[in-house]
């Protein structure tokens, strides 16, 4: 599951996800029957060039809510249960602060510590039963995990775009100052040349 943005002008926000997605597909999975679920237009456009895109969810950011994310999570869980996928990872930009985003790869399914918990022989009494609790809580937990990843990515996108635009503004201001200085120097040189020509002409007339 590759989470990117629908728009550009956000620095390396999307390209970092492209790089991580390609790296996982080629080095970790050795290009062995890898499929992507693309969340975001930029990721969908990039991944379609080289990989199989199982589905894309471009419009989710138009009205991001738990209900729409739950539908995606349910689809992923269903494909995992039906053994269409044997492992599902989520690749996204984790929000650290407005200026810093960290690309992370989280395992979505299978749940890594489920087997370890199952072998825990602690003497607990569950009401309702352990299986009923797991069947109820695990889907909710996975939906929340995906929702958090998308929200993190969304916040990171805005932070990355704000930082990129701030840098662009600073660069434009610096370029403007350089051009202004060059213009003033050229103007001063032109005025000096004109004065020299006038003085030279006056001296020639006097002679």
What residue spans do the PLM features occupy?
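C-terminal beta-strand-loop-alpha-helix "lid" module of Rossmann-like NAD(P)-dependent dehydrogenases
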Residues: 1-207
